[in-house]
Amino acid sequence: MNHAKRLRTLRRHMAAAGIESLLVTHLADVRYLCGFGGSNAALAIGRGRASLFTDGRYTVQAKQETSGAKVFIAEKSALREACASLAASGVAHVVFDPSSTTVADLEVMRAAIPSNQRRGFFRHSSTSLVADLRMVKDAEELVRMEEAALLGCRLFEELLPKIASGVQETTIAAELEYAARRNGAEGMSFATIVASGPRAALPHGHATSAAVPRSGFVVLDFGVILKGYCSDMTRTVFIGKASDDERFAYDSVRDAQQAAVDAVIPGVSSGEVDEAARSVLRKAGLAQYFTHSTGHGVGIEIHEAPRVAAAQTQVLTPGMVITIEPGIYLEGKFGIRIEDMVVVTDQAGRVITPASKALIEL
C-alpha cells in the first residue's frame, strides 16, 4: 500500500478545507494512512510531517508496519504526547474527528498543551476527511477485497452439505469459521450470523445452540478478513421443501436485491439504490417487513461510508465498494436476506460475491 501517497492526498484535502493540522485516533484510519495496526495509536499530521505515537508494546510492530510517518514510543499516553508535539510545532489549531473522540480523550488532549494555547486550539470537523478518502478504493484495495469476497463464496459452497435439520447453529458457525482460518483468513469480519426457523426473523440473529428445524429458512450472514480487508455476504437457504408463499417471499427479496444491484450506476445517489429495492418489495406487499437500510460501504472495516439508505444523497463514484442486502422479517415465522458486495465501476455495479442466489433447498 502506498501510504505516502495517501498522506499527500489527505494533505491536499486539508489545505482545501483550511486545516493546518490533523489528529487521527480512529485505529482503522491510522492503519489506512500509515499501515500501523496496533490497538493504541495517535497519528499527528502537522507542518510537513506525520508522526505516529504508540506505546512500548508496539515498538517492533510499529517499525515493521509504519510507512510515511515517523514513529515515537510514548512513555505514558500516546494521545497526550501526540497533542503535545503538535502544540510544540507552532501550529495554530488541530482538527479532530468527534466521532472517534470521547470526552475522556478530549480532557487528555487539553491537558497536553499549555493553558495559554488551549482557547480555540482544538477544532472538530463536521465530516471525516479520512472516511471520505477511504470510500473510494484504489486498485490494490480492490484486488484484496475481491480475494476476500471470493473466499467467502467458496466457504459458503463448502458449508452447504453441513447444514441440516438437527444441527446446532453454533456448529454451523464453527465449521465456517474454522474453514476460513484454514484458508488463510485472519479472522471474521463480524460475529457470524446463523439464524434458523423463526430465529431467521432476527436481522442480527447470531448463532445460538438452537437446532436447525425440520423445515424453514436459514439465514447465513458472514465475512472474512483477508490481507486486512473485510468481506460480507448473506445467503438464505431452505431446509425441506418451501411452500408457494415461502417461495414467493424468497423470490421477492431476490428480485429486490437484483433491482438494487442494477441501480448501482456512477452518478446516482445511494438513496436511489435503496429505493430500487424497496419499490420491488412494496409491489409485492412486503415492504413493511424490510426494516433496515439496503447496504453500506465495506473496506478495512465492515461498516464504512457510504450508507445505502433512504434519503441518502451520497453520489456513487467508481471505486466504491458497497453491500446490497435487502431482507424481510416476519416475527414468529421466518426471515430472508440476500447480500452481495458490489464494486462501482465506470459504467455499472460489479458483483464480487458470485455464489448462487437461487433458492437452495436442503
Question: Model-flagged regions — what are they?
Answer:
Residues 1-362:
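Active-site neighborhoods and metal-handling regions in enzymes and metal-associated proteins
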